[in-house]
Amino acid sequence: RSTPVDPSEWNRNDGFSPGAMIMAHVPRIDLDRTGAVRITDIARSLAEDAPILLIDAETGERQLIWSELDANATSPEGQALIIRPAKNLLESRRYIVALRNLRDADGAPLEPSPLFRAYRDKLNTGIEVYERRRPAMEDIFARLERAGVAREELFLAWDFTVASQRNITERLL
């Protein structure tokens, strides 16, 4: 019989690990048709037209990354898109992940979720909890635009913060 995990210790964290992989579920994505950067050519992740991006929210600087699909998934529908930073991210720093111009195996564009489309296209959802998130999403879109990422190209975008040095080390010392 399994024992439920107590998340109390994780809830004390002020951000994510600086070396953690980034994951998203993107049904039907084809990395080759999308032009996703692989580990063999990570410098392409800095290209203006890179479809999968990790951007420093403060500076707009693109980060070196590569992408792959989860090879351990039990079905193609369950595969996660894994985005791997090529080096550890800066502590206490906010980053933005942007996925754009994604394609399926036939080369057809993937459509964003209805909620993300509503944020991206400035459509009112009429749902208060979603609308409360809109200012944060608008900030993400503005930062991406300054970094040269067109809003209308986006399939999905979100931000996260890397944990502080104190948070990472304090319980060890």
Regions found by a protein language model. Give the residues of each.
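Acidic, low-complexity Ser/Thr/Gly/Pro-rich repeat segments typical of extracellular/periplasmic
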Residues: 1-173
